[in-house]
């Protein structure tokens, strides 16, 4: 987009219009960047933004080759010349922290960016748990109501996957307030609690640049150059390059283009409309495989609906929709309003019905489901499908629904070749969402991701460091801080010691935080939900990321880690574990110190007794007379019992180096 479409050259244009409104869209909702003029100023710079304090800032855009562009802010200025491709980039020293300031950019046009603050800028990246909104978090309604922080700003980078580096991001800067943080396009709960904790101590403005896409593995955020040395992603990289050269859709997801072309349920009045007459639709039992619809083994896009009744008055509080596991993708609506969507994962669906969605009396829930496998569809048990109101009242959702196939994959509308690979192909989010915001000046990054890599946890030890190094090279600001949210508890607890990929992912995250310079792990093993991969307790993770930053970057003397295993001492009939980070001493939460297991030379694990002795834990078991190795909290959903006096939990660990169950697993 050109900013002079509504004003003459050399006049002053206001960069306050949301970028999305001016972008031409391809089928699938992807911006036609190649067809549209490039903007004079990149949309990552706008009204209400935060500049990074204490270091040179880059600002860029596009003009005619050879044009000079002058940037002024505070008492500083810089001049840039547009290159052969029209891109100009100026670097300038920011004014002191605070504001507000106005940035004036003068060339063939003049643009003013107003209400600009100077402080600390953080990238907040990952998958759906980083994107999880503040309004959905525990006490979300109250948190949103209290979110009046004019010194906190955020920018949601529009979700986009691409086969080639993108120039122009989608999004706009917003001030944190009750009217901006809730709902679609609102603030990440984890990022919000992180920024609020930081701002309380450092007293400077905080800018959050949110880069989050649900269900994606870490390799989507790394470049091909970073992934090639790992040798695990060669097939995906080759396919990416093949598509780049074959002239396929430049952006987005082949399957979404297929949706948009053939899904009659989304055209001319959505099938999600609660007023739609579905009496002619086929009755079917949910959970089930849609066999009543006669689609057989053919992949299909099916819409299903059912009615449910709610009391008057509705109880207060956030309602949740539980749908069990669904294969393969779904979009869920209540009374015509989208309440959730999941792509390319088969985890249990749990969505939130924000205030105003539900009503007393008749309600309609509608799902659009892309079923890929012959035995796909709804995979859960009947009692997993339910609506839980704010007071705990349960409305069953299993049983009779009505369904209609919008399109199946038989000719003349077969699925496109390779449809299954996006948006999980290597590098597509790095090119689609990170490339257009680099080299934005920043303090560091926070990262909440790993769920989609748990089955390859051992590979993650090499993958995530490669991605971190790639980001540091992309932004060109040295080894900036990179702080990680550890995986919370998930799934149901095992009553016996087990091998577990989630435990191995937590071990990988701990390994990375210690191995990669200027990184830190915020352990959240004391949070989580056995039935929901998207737990509502985001405050703990966000604030613990803040402790990481305060201690490791700002040099404040604050505890940031729970007890950390430092030394293993093998005694006759017992193992003694020595811990660092025992701030205020070791503390037991719960009835007793639990979740320890031991094994001898036979490598068979048994639950153990554990007791505190100063800053050590003594572990033993009558089933293992000569214990050699110890594990703590080694399962997907352990009971966290070991803490320090600062209230921070110990990270799950093991003393053995026996082969992990995820060793050798790759993306291929």
Predicted regions and their residues:
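Non-catalytic, glycine-rich low-complexity segments
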Residues: 33-65, 114-124, 131, 285-295, ...
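Ser/Thr-rich low-complexity repeats and stalk/linker segments
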Residues: 34, 38, 42-120, 375
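Beta-strand-rich ligand-recognition modules
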Residues: 75-98, 332-384
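C-terminal beta-sandwich/jelly-roll accessory domains of carbohydrate-active enzymes
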Residues: 77, 576, 583-668
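Short, aromatic- and glycine-rich surface loops/edge beta-strands on solvent-exposed regions
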Residues: 98-108, 366-367, 628-634
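An acidic-aromatic loop/edge-strand motif
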Residues: 111-178, 209-292, 358, 362-440
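Catalytic cores of secreted or luminal carbohydrate-active enzymes
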Residues: 249-286, 505-594
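Aromatic-lined ligand-binding clefts that engage carbohydrates, nucleic acids, or primary amines
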Residues: 281, 308-336, 365-367
């Amino acid at each position: 987009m050109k900013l002079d479409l509504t004003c003459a050259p050399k006049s002053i244009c206001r960069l306050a219009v949301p970028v999305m409104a001016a972008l031409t869209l391809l089928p699938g909702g992807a911006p036609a960047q190649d067809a549209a003029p490039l903007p004079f100023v990149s949309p990552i710079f706008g009204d209400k933004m935060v500049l990074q304090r204490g270091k040179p800032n880059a600002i860029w855009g596009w003009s005619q080759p050879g044009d000079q562009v002058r940037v002024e802010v505070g008492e500083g200025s810089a001049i840039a010349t547009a290159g052969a491709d029209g891109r100009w980039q100026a670097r300038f020293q920011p004014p002191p922290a605070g504001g507000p300031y106005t940035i004036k950019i003068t060339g063939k046009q003049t643009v003013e960016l107003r209400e600009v603050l100077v402080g600390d800028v953080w990238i907040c990246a990952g998958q759906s748990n980083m994107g999880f909104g503040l309004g959905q978090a525990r006490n979300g309604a109250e948190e949103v109501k209290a979110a009046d922080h004019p010194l906190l700003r955020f920018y949601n980078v529009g979700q986009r996957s691409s086969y080639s580096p993108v120039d122009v991001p989608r999004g706009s800067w917003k001030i944190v307030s009750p009217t901006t943080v809730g709902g679609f396009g609102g603030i990440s709960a984890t990022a919000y609690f992180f920024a609020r904790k930081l701002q309380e101590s450092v007293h400077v403005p905080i800018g959050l640049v949110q880069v989050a896409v649900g269900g994606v593995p870490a390799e989507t955020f790394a470049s091909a150059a970073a992934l090639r040395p790992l040798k695990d992603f060669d097939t995906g990289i080759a396919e990416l390059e093949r598509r780049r050269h074959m002239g396929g859709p430049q952006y987005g997801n082949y399957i979404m283009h297929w949706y948009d072309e053939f899904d009659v349920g989304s055209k001319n009045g959505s099938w999600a409309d609660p007023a739609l007459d579905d009496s002619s639709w086929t009755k079917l039992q949910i959970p089930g495989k849609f066999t009543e619809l006669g689609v057989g083994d053919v992949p299909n896009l099916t819409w299903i609906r059912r009615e449910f009744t709610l009391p008057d008055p509705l109880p207060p509080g956030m309602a949740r929709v539980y749908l069990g596991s669904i294969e393969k993708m779904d979009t869920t609506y209540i009374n015509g309003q989208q309440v959730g969507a999941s792509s390319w994962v088969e985890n249990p669906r749990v969505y939130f019905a924000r205030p105003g969605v539900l009503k007393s009396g008749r309600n309609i829930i509608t799902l659009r489901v892309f079923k890929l496998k012959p035995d796909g569809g709804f995979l859960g048990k009947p009692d997993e499908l339910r609506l839980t109101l704010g007071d705990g009242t349960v409305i069953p959702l299993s049983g009779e629904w009505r369904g209609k196939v919008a399109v199946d994959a038989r000719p003349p509308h077969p699925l496109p070749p390779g449809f299954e690979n996006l948006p999980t192909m290597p590098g597509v989010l790095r090119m689609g969402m990170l490339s257009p915001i680099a080299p934005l000046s920043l303090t560091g990054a926070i990262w909440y991701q790993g769920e989609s890599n748990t089955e390859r946890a051992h590979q993650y030890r090499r993958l995530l460091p490669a991605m971190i190094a790639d980001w540091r090279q992309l932004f060109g600001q040295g080894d900036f801080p990179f702080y990680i949210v550890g995986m919370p508890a998930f799934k149901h607890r095992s009553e016996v010691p087990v091998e577990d990929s989630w435990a191995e992912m937590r071990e990988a995250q701990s390994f990375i935080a210690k191995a990669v310079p200027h990184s830190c792990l915020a352990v959240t093993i004391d949070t989580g939900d056995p039935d929901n991969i998207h737990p509502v307790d985001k405050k703990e993770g966000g604030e613990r990321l803040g402790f990481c930053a305060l201690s490791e970057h700002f040099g404040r003397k604050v505890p940031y880690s729970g007890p950390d295993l430092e030394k293993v001492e093998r005694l006759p009939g017992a193992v003694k574990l020595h811990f660092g980070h025992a701030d205020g001493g070791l503390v037991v939460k719960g009835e007793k110190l639990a979740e320890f297991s031991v094994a001898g030379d036979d490598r068979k694990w048994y639950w153990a007794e554990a007791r505190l002795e100063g800053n050590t834990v003594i572990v033993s078991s009558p089933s293992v007379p000569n214990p050699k190795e110890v594990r703590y909290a080694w399962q997907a959903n352990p009971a966290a019992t070991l803490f320090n006096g600062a209230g921070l939990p110990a990270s799950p660990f093991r003393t053995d180096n026996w082969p992990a169950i995820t060793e050798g697993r790759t993306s291929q």
